Structure formats: C-alpha cells, structure tokens
Amino acid sequence: VAGEFSLGDLAVRFGLLLRGEPDLRVSRVATLSHADAGALSFLANPRYRKQMQATRATVVLVGPDHAADCPVAALIDPNPYLAYARIANLLHPQAPPDAGIHSTAVVAASAHIADSACVGPLAVIEDEAKIGERVFVGPGCIVQRGAHIGADSRLMARVNVCAGVRIGRRCILHAGAVVGADGFGFAPDAGTWVKVPQVGSVQIGDDVEIGANTTIDRGAIDDTVVRHGVKLDNQIQVGHNVTIGAHTAIAGCVGISGSTTIGERCMIGGGVGIAGHLTIADDVVVTGCSLVSASIRNAGSYSSGMPAVETRMWRRMVAHLRRLDGKER
C-alpha cells in the first residue's frame, strides 16, 4: 500500500469531479459490500446499485447517471472502471524486485543479467540469455539460450521462455506460461507422421500480459508475433505463426490455430475456437464459445453457438431437428 491520499488530491490528479469533503482520505480499494472507512470503491455495473446505496466506503467512483444514488462521497467520471484502475494502481503499486541472484539459481557464464534484476530460487538462465533492468524472474523459471527479457518485465513462478524468444518491456508472464515451445507441425507419411522442425521464434511486444498456463508456440519458419499491449488470459493456446495485433484482449481457454492473423483492438471471448490461416480485422468482437471458421473482414461483433437451455427444451429441439431431417429424405 502506497499510503493515504485525500479525495481532493485524487480528483485533481485524475481529472475527476468530487462531490464531498476534499480532506477525506483513502488508503485502499474494496468492494461496495465489504468497504469501510478509508476504502475506495466503484460502481461500473448498474446491477450493483443497491450495494452502493448501503456501502460504508469513504468514497465511490461512479458515473454521472448514478451519482445521485451514492450515499457517501463520490468521485464522478464517465468511465468509473477506468478511473478505478488508475487509482488502484496508485494505492496498490507493484513493489520493485529486490536485486540479486538467489544462491540456488543456475546461471550460465555467458548470460547477461542486469544488476537491478532479481533471479529467484531454482531459476535457470541459459547461455547468452539477457535479463534487463529491474526484471523479476520468479522461482523455477527457465530462460533458455539466447532469450531476451525486456526491462521491468515480471516472470512469475515456473515460466518457461524458450530459446531465442524476445519479451518486451513491462510484460507480465503468469505462472506456468510457456513461450516458444515447438509448434504443432507434422507431415503425413503413409499413415505416420514426420516432425517438421520449428525454426522460427516468438516476438512479444511491450506491455503484454500473458495468463497462467498460456502457451505461445514458436513459428515454423517465420516468428509468432504478439504486438504491444496485448492481454491474454489463462490457458490460451496460440499456434505457430499467429500474429495478434496491438491492444487485443483474449479471454481464457481460447484456441488459435496456426498462421492466423488477429487485428488490433479485438476482444475475443472465453472458449472461442479460431481455425488456422484466417485473417480477423481490427476492432472485431467475438463472443464467448464461438467458432471462427472463416476470415472476418469487417469490424463488428460476431457470435455462433447456442446458449444453454433447460434439458427438456434441448431434447425437444433436437427431436424437431431429427424430424426435419426425416422429412427431407
């Protein structure tokens, strides 16, 4: 926690309209239902309005449409969730790593590690790897031969950055992420398979976040590319030679087949499957559990699949479909 901040200071610092006493102070964030004195909360979804009306927070970040319903001090902004994100980063800053290399880490003689970096217990840094300023390499991480980690990036426990991979500045790789494993490339040979060497690498831009147990395969020949500002949730599979455009956000359990290009500022919902060798335009939204089997050339929102219904209803629908099929025959 960074300390206490007055509401007046927060209003000036972040360009917010304050309704309430400017000398009131907050030191932490909390949900509307669990906040107490000294806590800041927010209302971004109207369904939680009743919780706001009963909150004990010192102040609530709220949009203009709901400010009148707030029983405590209000910091008013058209985008309260964005304002909350910025203030939460101020109140709960990421502590800088303690510089140094743990005694149990294994570091190759030819590796270059910045003096301000932190290498945790049982980490392995291989030949010619480069670890930038203020980088945190967590317990059990492996940074393979020739990989580069940009300044201020953080590798949580047991991240594997494979040979030759480039990670940009201010990136966060959560526990168990693997960047640069072999892509799924096999040539059929009379009922068997011959492995195709995966000789490309992976290029990760600046300010990228990669969720726990997400895997990004190295390119077959050219590199797999994740551009600046991309946000990847947990358990995503990114196939070889995929390109993900800047500031695209992808939710958990998405599978992206090889050689597909996703544009900038896209939002991909959880559980989406994307076939290979496709192009998805900038500013596309794909809703959860959809199947993308053809390229999407225009911005907009796209969906497929059927929402869950009661089992009885589902069985009736399937029965109707079967009868329709019988009529066609």
Locations of the language-model features?
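Terminal amphipathic alpha-helical/low-complexity segments used for targeting or macromolecular assembly
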Residues: 1-104, 165, 170, 176-177, ...
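Structural signal for interior beta-strand "rungs" in well-ordered beta-sheet cores
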Residues: 42, 100-310
